[in-house]
């Protein structure tokens, strides 16, 4: 493989983690955006998206040399738009060169025409020219020596300066030169069959593929497969305590929604997503005196909170750019990714120092990926999924599971006290997502067992109410048990926790078990029951509607 030197202004293909190569240009980074430590990388601005990121040199390839093979790999609409943007850029640059070339040619033609008109034609003039030619040559020779000597001195100084600024020298390359070289492969290996096939880049001998630095964002993630992301490059930036796995928590003595002793942070708070959980959270933040800017995909949901004193954000990017800490609570991994990486998304508003807290219940791969792209822009990231339901959200009695930037966790103290009774810090990003899925796996399986017990009581001629009374007097007694049984007995399945979401969490928990080769047969069985309930059009009802899967 040949080593190819890259420099400022070069057009390149940037490879970011699992995503397809994307065309971009090496540019100077903003003054307030520092280069990541320990990484040999360039700052690249991507065509078609106007996004940018620090990218390792191993993940960069020259644009022209690899254009054909990259186009064969990716046929997506956005990708083609990006390539078109590059070609338009090249056409404009070429047009400027041609204009400059034409101007020079015109000047040359005018000079030649002038010389032609003044050229001597008679024999006498030719002889005079010949006689004077010797003197002219002599004088020119002397002048040439003087000019050449001065030019040589200046040229030598310029060359010396250029050599000092550039690592390209003859002989053995200096250490710095290695930072500006990338391995160039003549073939593309390991292409996948799909239109969004991942491009396999050759790693350096000293750096395995697993340490790739995936910053890529602003892409149609729904077209790609499950990510295989590594968090090692980011954990150094996140201020977390590796040894803490849940020993730290912020607790309120009682329902913090009615606890007037909370001192709200003076930071500006943003909140994205006003669903069942988000609505209660925002309401409590406002009650406790926080300054909140809200955004929701359906803007009508914002009206009530505007009346309560919240401000309206037109886009997620606007909310993030105008707030110090932005929380988000959406339904699933796809929604979480779209919110961050989509048009006018969170990433567009992230600047150094901006904070993002994702409260969605998603898988560890998704939250790790989001953390990477946020941190790559200089932002701070915390995951903080919540355990509870709509009623607990309204009452400010949620349990918050947090992981990531420890400093940001502490900065969110007053917010967490307003929205929940307890919050736990679980260490590095991904831990909270895993814990949340396990909690919901237990809850979802328990709910399916409750429904199974009630239906079994019915078909065997036993009183369902008596069964509930017995359970409420035993060790299984809980608010959750009583409420869900009451829902079933009354036939009231108004959503407190959507059935489709608990099924989603069960599916993700099963996948988590598969990833570590751990059996989850109970969760798998419960998942099948919820899937049957969804087939019976119960997705938008409460999770207790799983009962109907047993009676149909």
Swiss-Prot record:
The record marks 216 as: Required to promote KDM1B demethylase activity toward histone H3K4me1 and H3K4me2. InterPro entries: 6-PGluconate_DH-like_C_sf (IPR008927), 6PGD_dom2 (IPR013328), 6PGDH_NADP-bd (IPR006115), GLYR1_PWWP (IPR035501), HIBADH-like_NADP-bd (IPR029154), HIBADH-related_NP60_sf (IPR051265), NAD(P)-bd_dom_sf (IPR036291), PWWP_dom (IPR000313). Gene3D superfamilies: 2.30.30.140, N-(1-d-carboxylethyl)-l-norvaline Dehydrogenase, domain 2 (1.10.1040.10), NAD(P)-binding Rossmann-like Domain (3.40.50.720). Residues 8-66 form the PWWP domain. Residues 215-224 are annotated as: Interaction with KDM1B. The modification Phosphoserine is found at residues 130, 166, 539. The keyword Nucleus applies. GO terms for molecular function: chromatin binding; chromatin-protein adaptor activity; DNA binding; histone binding; methylated histone binding; NAD binding; NADP binding; nucleosome binding. SUPFAM superfamilies: 6-phosphogluconate dehydrogenase C-terminal domain-like, NAD(P)-binding Rossmann-fold domains, Tudor/PWWP/MBT. Residues 91-187 are annotated as: Disordered. Residues 260-552 are annotated as: Dehydrogenase domain. NAD(+) binds at residues 270-284, 361, 504. Residues 91-145, 161-181 have a biased composition (Basic and acidic residues). Residues 167-179 bind DNA. It is found in: Nucleus; Chromosome. GO terms for biological process: transcription elongation-coupled chromatin remodeling; transcription initiation-coupled chromatin remodeling. Belongs to the HIBADH-related family. NP60 subfamily. Homotetramere. Interacts with MAPK14. Interacts with KDM1B at nucleosomes; this interaction stimulates H3K4me1 and H3K4me2 demethylation. Binds to mononucleosomes. Interacts with GATA4; the interaction is required for a synergistic activation of GATA4 target genes transcription. This is Cytokine-like nuclear factor N-PAC.
């Amino acid at each position: 493989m040949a080593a190819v030197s890259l420099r400022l202004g070069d057009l390149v293909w940037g490879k970011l983690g699992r995503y397809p190569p994307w065309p971009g240009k090496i540019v100077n980074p903003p003054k307030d955006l520092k280069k990541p430590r320990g990484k040999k990388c360039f700052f690249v601005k991507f065509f078609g998206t106007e996004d940018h990121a620090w990218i390792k040199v191993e993940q960069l390839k020259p644009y022209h040399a690899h254009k054909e093979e990259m186009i064969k790999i990716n046929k997506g609409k956005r990708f083609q738009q990006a390539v078109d943007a590059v070609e338009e850029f090249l056409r404009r640059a070429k047009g400027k060169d041609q204009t400059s070339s034409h101007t020079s040619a015109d000047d040359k033609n005018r000079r030649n025409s002038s010389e032609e008109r003044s050229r001597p034609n008679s024999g006498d003039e030719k002889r005079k020219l010949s006689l004077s030619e010797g003197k002219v040559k002599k004088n020119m020779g002397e002048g040439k020596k003087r000019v050449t000597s001065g030019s040589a001195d200046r040229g030598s100084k310029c060359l010396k300066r250029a050599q000092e600024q550039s690592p390209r020298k003859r002989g053995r390359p200096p250490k710095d030169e290695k930072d500006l070289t990338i391995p160039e492969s003549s073939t593309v290996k390991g292409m996948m069959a799909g239109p969004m096939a991942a491009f396999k880049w050759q790693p350096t001998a000293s750096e395995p593929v697993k340490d790739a630095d995936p910053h890529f964002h602003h892409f149609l993630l729904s077209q790609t497969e499950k990510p295989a992301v590594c968090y090692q490059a980011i954990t150094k930036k996140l201020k977390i305590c590796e040894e803490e796995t849940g020993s730290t928590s912020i607790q309120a003595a009682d329902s913090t929604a009615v606890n007037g002793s909370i001192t709200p942070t003076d930071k500006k708070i943003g909140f994205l997503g006003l669903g069942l959980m988000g609505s209660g959270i925002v309401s409590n933040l406002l009650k406790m005196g926080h300054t909140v800017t809200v955004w929701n995909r359906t803007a009508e949901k914002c009206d009530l909170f505007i009346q309560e004193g919240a401000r309206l954000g037109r886009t997620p990017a606007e909310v993030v750019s105008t707030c110090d800490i932005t929380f988000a609570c959406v339904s699933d991994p796809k929604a979480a990714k779209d919110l961050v990486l989509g048009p006018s998304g969170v990433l567009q508003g992230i600047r150094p120092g901006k904070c993002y807290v994702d409260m969605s219940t998603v898988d560890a791969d998704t939250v790790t990926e989001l953390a990477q792209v946020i941190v790559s822009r200089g932002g701070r990231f915390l995951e903080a999924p919540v355990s509870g339901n709509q009623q607990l959200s309204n009452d400010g009695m949620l349990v918050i599971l947090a992981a990531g930037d420890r400093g940001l966790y502490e900065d969110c103290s007053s917010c967490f006290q307003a929205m929940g009774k307890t919050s736990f810090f679980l260490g590095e990003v991904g831990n909270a997502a895993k814990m949340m899925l396990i909690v919901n796996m237990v809850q979802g399986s328990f709910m399916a067992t409750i429904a199974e017990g009630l239906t079994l009581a019915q078909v065997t001629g036993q009183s369902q109410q008596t069964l509930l009374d017995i359970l409420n007097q035993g060790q299984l007694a809980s608010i959750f048990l009583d409420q869900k049984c009451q829902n079933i007995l009354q036939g009231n399945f108004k959503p407190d926790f959507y059935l489709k979401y608990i099924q989603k969490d069960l599916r993700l928990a099963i996948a988590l078990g598969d990833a570590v080769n751990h059996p989850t047969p109970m969760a798998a069985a419960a998942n099948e029951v919820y899937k049957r309930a969804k087939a019976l059009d119960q997705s938008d009802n409460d999770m207790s509607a799983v009962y109907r899967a047993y009676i149909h």
